[in-house]
UniProtKB/Swiss-Prot annotation:
Coiled coil: none
Protein name in UniProt: Putative ankyrin repeat protein R747
Keyword Cell division belongs to the record: no
Keyword set, alphabetical order: ANK repeat
Source superkingdom: Viruses
Gene3D superfamilies xrefs: Ankyrin repeat-containing domain
Per-repeat ranges for ANK: 70-99
Keyword Metal-binding recorded: no
Source species: Acanthamoeba polyphaga mimivirus
InterPro entries, A to Z: Ankyrin_rpt-contain_sf
Length: 118
């Protein structure tokens, strides 16, 4: 069974703790690259349980500062997609907000700038 198919467990009607436990069980066999790709996919698809999935992936050992392809970190990607719940979750889990993507702008500055502009 594919990893993404295992995530399609029925989560409606479960408590937050039960959702986190079920998602964690589904992701147990995934490596960091697979976990990061799943996070990227749930951001792209605006999955309603994305915060639980991000928390489960980090609880399984994925660094909140994991670098995706093309030199984007998870936080960069969430900021680029303007995904506030994932941004907050990554920051709460310890993502480096002081890393500078460009010479004079931190992640937090870019996020604030995006919010103000839109």
């Amino acid at each position: 069974m594919r990893l993404m198919d295992r995530l399609m467990v029925k989560l409606d009607g479960l408590t937050k703790q039960q959702k986190l436990e079920n998602i964690t069980k589904a992701l147990l066999s995934a490596n960091n690259k697979e976990l990061a790709n799943i996070i990227r996919n749930v951001i792209d698809n605006n999955d309603k349980d994305k915060v639980f999935i991000v928390n489960a992936a980090i609880n399984l050992g994925l660094s909140p500062d994991y670098m995706l392809m093309n030199c984007y970190y998870l936080l960069d990607y969430a900021i680029m997609k303007n995904d506030i719940p994932v941004i907050v979750t990554l920051i709460e889990k310890g993502a480096n907000i002081n890393r500078r993507k460009y010479s004079d702008c931190s992640h937090l500055h870019l996020c604030a700038q995006d919010i103000i502009m839109y």
